[in-house]
Amino acid sequence: MSIDIEKAIVRSIDEIVIGPKRLTKYEKARIVAARALQLAMGAPPLIDISSLQNKDPVIIAERELLLGVLPILIKREKPNGEYQLIPLKILADIERKKVEKLNDIIIKHFGEEHSLL
């Protein structure tokens, strides 16, 4: 069964039918690891890192993921061969909202110095 590539690319969160409507921990781990390896090998960061206290490639990769600047498509596939291509930016928006909520709770209970962002 062949799927037209344009039809397979998701344009909004509502179009996701394969897998959860969020970034899974496995997808996140693979993306962060691959990007951290690229950064460690000398690839330029896609964000301004001057404000980061720690210049560790994993920290930079996680920040790039949260900001949705990585030009990556996630391919989610069913056993029968059907698949969807989901731009990371769509899933990163959901991840960022989740982290912002968690950050608000941390600041409320522990103060600004413990902020995640």
Annotate the PLM regions.
Residues M1-A34, Q38-L117:
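Polar low-complexity intrinsically disordered regions
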